């Protein structure tokens, strides 16, 4: 099923509207770079600033551009269950291969509430693979391994989880509760290799928008058991992985992608541009990785 590098695409805007041409360019960059899948509408895509219709259109554009070459796994979670159900049904009907549903944010539900929330999503699309998106730093709550295990036993279409936390002990308990064949993806760029050494099958890393070949190769080496080769790539990618978080994601990501000519340097409020100091750090990082056009390097 799903494995390897599945880049979470940023949502490109131009004068406040979805820039479909830029989104298609991003798809081509990561697919031609060897990525094993594509995700749209996750944290990197600023979904909380978009209407459901905008999110649906982004899914349609990505599916059309990918054209079946790799799996597409949109983020379909929202705060309101009804919106999550609508967007998840839409993703399935549009032809996506699965969906990633974030732990509901802000309201800080208890574990029984989380179980019932994900159970309703799973019942609504019973033959559609679902990944739970565990991101306690944004959601304000973490879904417990026991809750995930319960969901996995009750709903076979809950096939995996994206883990966006530095807590590696969580993974050990997760595999014990949900099974060693549960599909875990790393959601923190610099922890891809550590998580894969514990049994994760890949990464959903924003860095792969900058360096798709390198991130895909790291995953391939780890999956093949070539941990020496994977370690070399881990250290090679470390600065880029850390740079994603020099400001709120996706601000650094979009800043560098704009210099690369792939999209406009534009976000939806309340996000805004980073500081000149961070921009200078990003410019030096991008130069070291060979990401900038020659004229930008000389500027």
Swiss-Prot record:
It is an enzyme of class 4 (lyase). Pathway: Amino-acid biosynthesis; L-lysine biosynthesis via DAP pathway; (S)-tetrahydrodipicolinate from L-aspartate: step 3/4. One of its GO terms (biological process) is lysine biosynthetic process via diaminopimelate. The active site is at 133 (proton donor/acceptor), 162 (schiff-base intermediate with substrate). It is found in: Cytoplasm. One of its GO terms (molecular function) is 4-hydroxy-tetrahydrodipicolinate synthase activity. Its EC number is 4.3.3.7. It catalyses: L-aspartate 4-semialdehyde + pyruvate = (2S,4S)-4-hydroxy-2,3,4,5-tetrahydrodipicolinate + H2O + H(+). One of its GO terms (cellular component) is cytoplasm. The record marks 43, 106 as: Part of a proton relay during catalysis. Homotetramer; dimer of dimers. HAMAP family: DapA (MF_00418). NCBIfam families: dapA (TIGR00674), HpaI-NOT-DapA (TIGR02313). Belongs to the DapA family. This is 4-hydroxy-tetrahydrodipicolinate synthase. It comes from Thermus thermophilus (strain ATCC 27634 / DSM 579 / HB8). The gene is dapA.
């Amino acid at each position: 099923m799903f494995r390897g590098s599945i880049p979470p695409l940023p949502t490109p805007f131009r004068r406040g509207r979805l820039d479909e041409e830029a989104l298609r360019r991003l798809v081509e960059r990561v697919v031609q770079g060897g990525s094993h899948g594509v995700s749209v509408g996750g944290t990197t895509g600023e979904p909380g600033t978009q209407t459901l219709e905008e999110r649906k259109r982004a899914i349609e554009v990505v599916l059309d551009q990918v054209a079946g070459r790799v799996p597409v796994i949109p983020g379909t979670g929202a705060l309101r269950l009804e919106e999550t159900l609508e967007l998840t049904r839409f993703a399935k009907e549009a032809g996506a291969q699965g969906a990633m549903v974030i732990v509901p944010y802000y309201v800080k539900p208890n574990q029984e509430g989380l179980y019932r929330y994900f159970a309703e999503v799973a019942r609504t699309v019973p033959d559609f693979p679902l990944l739970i998106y565990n991101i306690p730093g944004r959601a304000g709550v973490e879904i417990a391994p026991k809750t995930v295990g319960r969901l996995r036993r009750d709903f076979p279409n809950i096939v995996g989880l994206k883990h966006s936390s530095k807590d590696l002990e969580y993974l050990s308990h997760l595999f014990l509760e949900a099974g060693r064949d549960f599909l875990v993806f790393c959601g923190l760029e610099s922890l891809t290799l550590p998580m894969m050494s514990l049994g994760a099958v890949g990464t959903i890393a924003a860095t792969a928008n900058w360096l798709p070949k390198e991130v895909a190769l790291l995953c391939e080496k780890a999956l093949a058991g070539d941990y020496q080769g994977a370690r070399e790539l881990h250290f090679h990618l470390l600065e880029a992985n850390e740079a994603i978080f020099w400001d709120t994601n996706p601000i650094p990501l979009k800043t560098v992608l704009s210099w690369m000519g792939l999209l406009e340097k534009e976000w939806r409020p309340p996000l805004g541009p980073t500081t000149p100091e961070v921009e200078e750090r990003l410019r030096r990082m991008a130069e070291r990785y060979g990401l900038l056009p020659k004229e930008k390097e000389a500027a």
